[in-house]
């Protein structure tokens, strides 16, 4: 018995399904729905280029070629005008039906979060407590002046750095002055260590004494110089 011929299932591939088989070099329509695509007519000018138009309108060169049915080697100046495909927003297609959702979104954006409400209430409490305190009783100096490093602005940080540098300079200058004033005292304490220096310090300068021998030597030298 001959096997019964198999019939192709309904909705199969090919022409029965309604889809067109792609071939090399064929022009295929865009996969985007034509309802979401809006075409803008551009009048060509001598300085226009395909890349420049793509950058100007925010589309790709392939989209412009596909919309105007241009091949790769074709020049854009074969036509007087080019159609630029621009995708429209999905909300524009509802014709105002989505206005309620937009209003709800706007209300959600306007409403503050719980964290913001808590922080604002905390600030108000701090301000109220500060105003309730008498003017005479202020915060201690270390609490009033000390602020966290991450809360300091750039100018405050630079001012703090300058003050620290000036304080370090003053401390270094004071140390130098103390060192200069202490040097002579140390020097004077070193000299009297030897007994001869101690004797000179006590008795004063030793007077010169001339003996007969020194006198004769001096006379002989004078005679030699005279000759």
From Swiss-Prot:
Biased composition (Acidic residues): 98-108
Gene3D superfamilies linked to this entry: LysM domain
Renumbered residue ranges of the record's region Disordered: 95-157, 169-227
A Pfam match: LysM
Biased composition (Polar residues): 143-152
SMART domains per the UniProt record, alphabetical: LysM (SM00257)
Zinc as UniProt keyword: no
Modified residues (Phosphoserine): 23, 33, 99, 166, 181, 194, 212
Domain LysM: from-to ranges: 40-84
Biased composition (Basic and acidic residues): 216-227
InterPro entries: LYSM1-4, LysM_dom, LysM_dom_sf
Keywords for the protein's UniProt record, in alphabetical order: Phosphoprotein
Superkingdom of the source species: Eukaryota
Keyword match Phosphoprotein: yes
Name of protein: LysM and putative peptidoglycan-binding domain-containing protein 1
Species: Rattus norvegicus (Rat)
Gene: Lysmd1
